[in-house]
Amino acid sequence: MKTKEIVDDVTMKRAITRITYEIIERNKQLDNVVLAGIKTRGVFLARRIQERLHQLEGLDLPIGELDIKPFRDDMRVEEDTTLMSVDITGKDVILIDDVLYTGRTIRAAIDNLVSLGRPARVSLAVLVDRGHRELPIRADYVGKNIPTSSVEEIVVEVVEVDGRDRVSIVDPT
């Protein structure tokens, strides 16, 4: 198994900052925006975007944590640990995740969102888009496009969970 670091901590920080600037540029009314991180690493990325938005615009946007497990199509989980402290009805919700791959995680996240309310708009921000979609889903904000083969894996590490920030590509062959 071969592992290669393709994004270091500095590059990851820059990608998150770029996503934050794009959110500012594309959303005229930031006061109507809610950030929704997909557990687990998407939540920490959402918090970082929230912090950058505060630094750049002086805004404290609400943030939620989406648990997609009860909404997945390949497993059955009863407990839903979603934390959404704000009513998302009529809001512009930005889903945030670490990697966009087949699109199934995002589909489950959207199912979770609409179970909570009726957002005015839903957009998607991801740190890494690796391709290989199985569903017609695309990201509105992308930190890095990293094409992979179907056997390779993208591993995102964040300091809050893994002790360091980096993105690696793993080839199991």
Curated annotation (Swiss-Prot):
Motif (PRPP-binding): 93-105
One Pfam assignment: Pribosyltran
InterPro entries cross-referenced by the UniProt entry: PRibTrfase_dom, PRTase-like, PyrR, PyrR_bifunctional
Top EC group: transferase
Entry-linked CDD domains: PRTases_typeI (cd06223)
GO biological process: DNA-templated transcription termination
Keyword rRNA-binding: no
Chain's role: Regulates transcriptional attenuation of the pyrimidine nucleotide (pyr) operon by binding in a uridine-dependent manner to specific sites on pyr mRNA. This disrupts an antiterminator hairpin in the RNA and favors formation of a downstream transcription terminator, leading to a reduced expression of downstream genes. Also displays a weak uracil phosphoribosyltransferase activity which is not physiologically significant.
Family to which this protein belongs: Belongs to the purine/pyrimidine phosphoribosyltransferase family. PyrR subfamily.
NCBIfam families the record matches: PRK05205.1-4, PRK05205.1-5
Protein name per Swiss-Prot or TrEMBL: Bifunctional protein PyrR
Protein species of origin: Streptococcus pyogenes serotype M5 (strain Manfredo)
